[in-house]
Amino acid sequence: MNPFILSILLLSLGLGTTLTFASSHWLLAWMGLEISTLAIIPLMSQHHHPRAVEATTKYFITQAAAAALILFASTTNAWITGQWDINFDLHFFPASMLTMALALKMGLAPVHFWLPEVLQGLDLTTGLILSTWQKLAPFILMCQIMPVNSSLITFLGVTSTLVGGWGGLNQTQLRKILAYSSIAHLGWMILVMQFNQQLALLALIIYIPMTFSTFMIFKTNSSTTVNTLAASWAKTPALTAITPMILLSLGGLPPLSGFMPKWMILQELTKQDIPLTASIAALSALLSLYFYLRVSYAMTLTISPNNLNATTPWRLQTTASTLPLAISATISAMLLPLAPATLALLSL
């Protein structure tokens, strides 16, 4: 893609999300969401592959339906209450519609079916943008309409953690595994959002570098399926040694960074006297941990078949900067000692 066009699209992507962040009016927030959607569509279809075009079409139809529902719900709320302000108390019916529309935009279960299929048709870089940046604006909007319908939010959170764990079990495609991982992590954030929004934001902040690291590692290895990871030792031995730590951090295993938000969320849910919800979320994390372990095993403990006379793949020096990956990998693995300081900051 032309660098000038690419810079305009990325700028529009940032502008749309920033507009939604800064808006206190539902029409402006809707406009920001639409700018982001329209900016990412050319990035998704830039390779002109039938799968990419199919994924782009599915994404466009889903996002258009969600945007129409947001517009309808906000108009209905303005008609009932006479207010367009986001921070104004919403009527229960429009609030429920808005929650479902934002859940559809983010890919929360049970309206998640588009996300694995769309991610499967994209390259890893665009998939990374879809899994991280595109979640921010709907997430912030959901934070602002939170106090209205807690039972619907709890249902979305529990369903997402279960579906995110269950759906990834039988997958061999790495992009689908990462899609279900995204659904499960968003489920954890949504569960705690109604009780402690700072904790939900902390989970999102830690989720982003972990996902960034995982996507970048798979891109460096040119891997799209679990089976192709077997050649990782020959291509990038140092990166392959670090990868299990990042994957197990995504699974929430101590003493890695990913354990911190899960630990704090379970603590908060128990404080709020909903131990059953906390238990279901904790057990669903075991399902996710299994498929992260499977990917780690395929990458580090298996070697691709070759005879002794054959040469190993060339370890070509990458031309891209490895600094962002190094920083995100460090954050993904080593933030747990900061948990007491984080708890103190959250309780201010």
Swiss-Prot record:
The keyword Electron transport applies. InterPro entries: Complex_I_Subunit_2 (IPR050175), NADH_DH_su2_C (IPR010933), NADH_UbQ_OxRdtase_chain2 (IPR003917), ND/Mrp_TM (IPR001750). The chain crosses the membrane at residues 3-23, 24-44, 60-80, 95-115, 136-156, 177-197, 198-218, 239-259, 273-293, 325-345. It comes from the Eukaryota. One of its GO terms (cellular component) is mitochondrial inner membrane. GO terms for biological process: mitochondrial electron transport, NADH to ubiquinone. GO terms for molecular function: NADH dehydrogenase (ubiquinone) activity. Keywords: Electron transport, Membrane, Mitochondrion, Mitochondrion inner membrane, NAD, Respiratory chain, Translocase, Transmembrane, Transmembrane helix, Transport, Ubiquinone. Its EC number is 7.1.1.2. It holds the Pfam family Proton_antipo_M. It catalyses: a ubiquinone + NADH + 5 H(+)(in) = a ubiquinol + NAD(+) + 4 H(+)(out). This is NADH-ubiquinone oxidoreductase chain 2. It comes from Gadus morhua (Atlantic cod).
